[in-house]
Amino acid sequence: MTRGPGERPELADAGPAVLVAVEDRIATVTLNRPRARNALSRAVMHGLWDAVAAAGDDPGVAAVILTGADPAFCAGIDLKEVAGDAPPAVPPRDPGLGPGRDTNGLFRFLPVIGKPVIGAVNGVAVTGGLEVALQCTFLVASQRARFADTHARLGVMPGGGITVLMAQSMGLRRAIELSLTGNFLTADEALRLGLVNHVVPHEELLPFTRRLAGDIAGNDQDAVRRLLQHYRQVASAATLDEAHLIEGYLAETWRPGMTQVAGRRAAVTARGRAQASDAD
């Protein structure tokens, strides 16, 4: 089964922006703009939201896997679209009907569902792509995976939870270093720091992740949902909600010119690719 909105012909890859396949009670959601390194265009964000929401509503689905079409997991927000170089392929949605800022200030790329969403990170997860990964329940990484937060390089503020979720995963000081430098982490470094749960050979990424999802699907689903709810309540303590609100406020009030951001895009991309290549 596949579904998802189409994209502009000049930028489109084969097929819809997001692919969905359901098998053995596991929904595999794939970002499908490989030529654009699965950048988050509006079409991709809407397709991703709809796919995860549909899996959450489907009684035949017990777990979700989120991955990207090789070679990247997700290179972040589509800066060409943001800068106006290429108009969005789909219209905006009303608040609450798709990706957007939550009541606690967090910009949600993924809806909150009562099922685990396991991120299978197959390549680079950069900035907005890293935020998508962090909004997953937990992560499995290919040996080809690379992680970076380039908000400071671009001169924009994060809004998707990096300053909270990354600090929770790997510790405050490590998260600060990653954000302020914009440097890349290898998959093994991400494992050592606690950002990901497992690192596996690239060809084993989806089979390994499917086995984990199958283990979850084989458990009592009421217990799974209740455990997820409890963990989320612990992670959403008042101080963290306040942190999300602060990050959301910074993101909403920081308004660099889109021309300036677009002008930095090429340099940031070149530097990131060089670092990712050096890590191989």
Where are these regions (language model features)?
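Short, active-site-adjacent cap segments at secondary-structure transitions
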Residues: 71-75, 126, 231-234
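A general structural signal for well-ordered alpha-helical segments in protein cores
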Residues: 79, 103, 163, 172-175, ...
